[in-house]
Swiss-Prot record:
Protein EC: 2.3.1.181
NCBIfam families, alphabetized: lipB, PRK14342.1
InterPro entries, A to Z: aa-tRNA-synth_II/BPL/LPL, BPL_LPL_catalytic, Octanoyltransferase, Octanoyltransferase_CS
Main location: cytoplasm
Catalysed reactions, semicolon-separated: octanoyl-[ACP] + L-lysyl-[protein] = N(6)-octanoyl-L-lysyl-[protein] + holo-[ACP] + H(+)
Protein name as annotated: Octanoyltransferase
Length: 212
């Protein structure tokens, strides 16, 4: 029997996906199989629980949604790989800090496959290349189970990041995989990063699914 279901969902609207995550987490029990949801979102700013309104400088035509994850404001859009981690931390005897570290290290290993030297920072969660942020993290834990997750910039229009202070840091530089790896695609990065996450989180029986 699978101990992890990996869903490739394509492009999904943010609100419906967030509601689905909350519902999944509220209704799961100790026998529920963990899931990873891999997708892209249409253009949207999301403001985390620690977010301040002044960090949203000029949203313009992009909607802003107040959400229940940790962290501050970030941007999602086509060409960015989003992976939501619906993990029973109690079952895995995993603390939140250990989960964050496992995610960051999986991203670092994934990028290294393409010759990109990346690293986390102790003062600002996420993964960075030469000081520029390439991946953001924001999690919520409820009843010992995680939801929300990571966003890796792959091959996207980066302009909307200039409309905010990403993660609450004024002037933070952002970058993406395609800056360093020609031809980078969300599909390829999804395949590589899921493999590293599975290894880092210790799942052994993985079931791949297309769609819900």
């Amino acid at each position: 029997m699978a101990d992890l279901i990996v869903r490739s969902l394509g492009q999904q609207p943010y609100m419906e996906t967030w509601e689905a995550m909350k519902s999944f987490t509220a209704n799961r029990d100790e026998t529920t199989v963990d899931e990873l949801w891999c997708l892209e979102h249409p253009r949207v700013f999301t403001q985390g629980q620690a977010g301040k309104a002044e960090h949203i400088l000029l949203p313009g035509d992009i909607p802003v949604i107040q959400v229940d994850r940790g962290g501050q404001v970030t941007y999602h859009g086509p060409g960015q790989l989003v992976i939501y981690l619906l993990i029973d931390l109690t079952r895995h005897k995993l603390g939140v800090r250990n989960l964050v570290s496992a995610i960051e290290q999986a991203i670092v290993r994934t990028l290294a496959q393409g010759g990109i030297e990346a690293a986390p920072r102790s003062d600002a969660p996420g993964v960075y290349v030469n000081g520029a942020k390439i991946a953001s993290l924001g999690l919520r834990v409820r009843r010992g189970c995680s939801f929300h997750g990571l966003a890796l910039n792959v091959n996207m229009d980066m302009e909307p990041f200039s409309r905010i202070n990403p993660c609450g840091y004024a002037g933070m530089s952002m970058c993406q995989v395609s800056d360093f790896e020609a031809g980078a695609s969300v599909y390829d990065l999804e395949r590589r990063l899921v493999s590293e996450l599975v290894e880092g989180l210790g799942h052994s029986q993985v079931e791949q699914r297309q769609g819900w």
